[in-house]
Each structure stands twice: as structure tokens, then as C-alpha cells.
């Protein structure tokens, strides 16, 4: 009887405030995925993130193949170190395009446009990464949430801090997020936000 009451309470809690449960998921670190560290869903079906886990280097062939088999359409390396140029990985799910773009300025804007185009065309998701999957990757993911999901600067910074040790929470990166201004030309419809945006607690 006690177990039944507990289940009933949990069911009511979920029905009354499901967004709070979804909000907990976005604020967690991710697992290792075929060698890719801290693999996380940012915007379901549209944007994913992680770290290369290869030192100061881009993704290796095995990691690219795993992303391709997971039906990711584009992988973006947010640095230039060790990058030998754009490539295409073929797999049973199709093709994965691998490119590099900066995590700041026009590079970040290009990443946001790539995500926007993928959503509008109902294409495959985008995966972004840096070396460890926290600083640059987190900043681009945080500003994407501001761009597409109406997330506040404070919420975005709180999201970026997940998995980042306090001593490595660099003011430069935080300021980059706080000062970001969404591009009005890349706005999603309310229906698209409902489909692709995670839930955050009010903040």
C-alpha cells in the first residue's frame, strides 16, 4: 500500500510540473559515447555536444563513424589545432560532414546558422566539440539555447558551469555568454521551440 501511494504521488508530481523533471536532465554531465567524452543532448534532435578525448586534437575516425551511425549529419570542431580540413565519413546511416569553426564571433554565428538550417529543413542534427567538451563547446551550446530557446543569460551561464570545475570557470567565457545577443533572423516558431528546446526551471 505504501508503494502504491508513493507511485501515485510521483505520478501527480510529474503531471503537475513535468518541466521541472526535464529541467534536471539538461543540467547534468553526459556519458562517454564511443570515446567521445561528456556526450550531451542540448536540443533534442537538433544539437549535441561533447569532447574529443584525444588530447589537443580533433575527432578520430572511430569517433566520427560512431556519430555517423548515430545519425548525426554535421560535426563541428570548435578549434583549429590538428585539423587537416573538412571531411566526409560514410556509414550505414548516410554521411557525416566534419568541419571546423571558431567558438566565438562569426564562427559561433555560423554554427548557430547550421543548427537553424538543420531545424528548418528537418535535417540531421549537429554535433559540436572541443578538446574536453566544456569551455568552447559549452559556450556555443549555451548561446544556442539563448538564440533558439529564449534562455536567459543567467540560465545560460548556469548551464555552461555544469561539469566545469570552479577554478576553470573563466570570466572571459562567462562574459562571452552574458554579452551574446540573439540574431532576430534565426528565430524559431513556437511549435519548433516546443519540439527542439529543453525545459529550464524559471530563473
PLM-predicted stretches and their roles:
Residues 21-127, 139-203:
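Cys-dependent protein tyrosine phosphatase-like superfamily
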Residues 8-18:
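Bacterial N-terminal signal peptides
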Residues 130:
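Short cysteine clusters
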Residues 1-8:
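Bacterial N-terminal signal peptides that target proteins for export
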Residues 133:
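Substrate/cofactor-recognition hotspot
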Residues 136:
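Active-site environment of divalent metal-dependent phosphoester hydrolases
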Amino acid at each position: 500500500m505504501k508503494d502504491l501511494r508513493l507511485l501515485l504521488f510521483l505520478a501527480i508530481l510529474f503531471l503537475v510540473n513535468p518541466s521541472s523533471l526535464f529541467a534536471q536532465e539538461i543540467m547534468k554531465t553526459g556519458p562517454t559515447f564511443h570515446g567521445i567524452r561528456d556526450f550531451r543532448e542540448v536540443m533534442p534532435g537538433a544539437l549535441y555536444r561533447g569532447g574529443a578525448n584525444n588530447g589537443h586534437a580533433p575527432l578520430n575516425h572511430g569517433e566520427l563513424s560512431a556519430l555517423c551511425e548515430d545519425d548525426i549529419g554535421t560535426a563541428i570542431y570548435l578549434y583549429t589545432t590538428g585539423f587537416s580540413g573538412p571531411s566526409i565519413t560514410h556509414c550505414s546511416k548516410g554521411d557525416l560532414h566534419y568541419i571546423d569553426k571558431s567558438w566565438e564571433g562569426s564562427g559561433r554565428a555560423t554554427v548557430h546558422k547550421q543548427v537553424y538550417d538543420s531545424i528548418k529543413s528537418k535535417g540531421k542534427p549537429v554535433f559540436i566539440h572541443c578538446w574536453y567538451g566544456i569551455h568552447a563547446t559549452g559556450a556555443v551550446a549555451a548561446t544556442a539555447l539563448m538564440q533558439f530557446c529564449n534562455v536567459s543569460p543567467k540560465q545560460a551561464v548556469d548551464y555552461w558551469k555544469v561539469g566545469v570545475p570552479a577554478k576553470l570557470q573563466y570570466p572571459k567565457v562567462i562574459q562571452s555568454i552574458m554579452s551574446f545577443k540573439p540574431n532576430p533572423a534565426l528565430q524559431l516558431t513556437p511549435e519548433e521551440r516546443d519540439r527542439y528546446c529543453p525545459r529550464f526551471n524559471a530563473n
